[in-house]
């Protein structure tokens, strides 16, 4: 075999491994009946870590953005998320990591399947059904991408 054949085989194997590893952060979508009604008040609202734990424990369908005030990308992203939440009349929550204790941050980082298995930063958006991760957005995306994230997955208000 030629050197290029070995390189090609190596690249294909790496892509397969990356695909397998990256798919472990979310639950199989075919198991979930869409659209889901998100719990909570319409718009973008900060929740405490205790409120987050309660939503997980109750098996609620909810979207939580993990952000921090001092994050430049969060400062750009959060107004877009708020705009989409208000326009589509859906409930979106967020946890500001600057407002939780170190112990709560540690619990959040180690008990949430996505955060435990993946490197993450802020903003991170998680669509959750109890403790199951339905989908996620890692980092800043534009408004159209946020709208696409919700499309056909959530009940839009009227």
Model-derived features with residue positions:
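Local sequence-structure signature of Cys/Sec-based thiol-disulfide redox active-site neighborhoods
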Residues: 51-91
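N-terminal targeting signals for export/organelle localization
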Residues: 1-42
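Thiol-based oxidoreductase modules, predominantly thioredoxin-like and allied folds used
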Residues: 43-46, 90-108
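Non-catalytic, surface beta->alpha helical segment in thiol-disulfide oxidoreductase systems
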Residues: 119-158
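Short Fe-S-cluster ligation motifs
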Residues: 101-121
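Extracytoplasmic/periplasmic, Sec-exported soluble proteins
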Residues: 44, 69, 73-76, 117, ...
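Structural recognition of the beta-strand scaffold that forms the well-ordered cores
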Residues: 63-65, 92-95, 124-127
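Solvent-exposed loop/turn segments at secondary-structure junctions
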Residues: 69-73, 98-102, 132-134, 142
């Amino acid at each position: 075999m030629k050197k290029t054949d070995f390189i090609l085989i190596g690249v294909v194997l790496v892509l397969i491994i990356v695909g397998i590893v990256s798919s472990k952060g979310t639950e199989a979508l075919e198991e979930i009946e869409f659209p889901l009604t998100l719990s909570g008040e319409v718009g973008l609202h900060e929740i405490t870590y205790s409120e987050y734990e309660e939503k997980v424990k109750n098996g609620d369908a909810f979207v939580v953005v993990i952000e921090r005030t001092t994050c430049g990308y969060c400062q750009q992203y959060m107004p877009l998320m708020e705009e989409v939440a208000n326009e589509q009349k859906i409930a979106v929550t967020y946890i500001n990591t600057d407002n939780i204790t170190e112990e709560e941050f540690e619990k959040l980082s180690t008990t949430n399947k996505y955060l435990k298995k993946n490197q993450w930063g802020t903003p991170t958006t998680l669509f959750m059904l109890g403790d199951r991760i339905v989908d996620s957005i890692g980092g800043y995306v534009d408004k159209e991408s946020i709208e696409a994230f919700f499309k056909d997955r959530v009940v839009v208000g009227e």
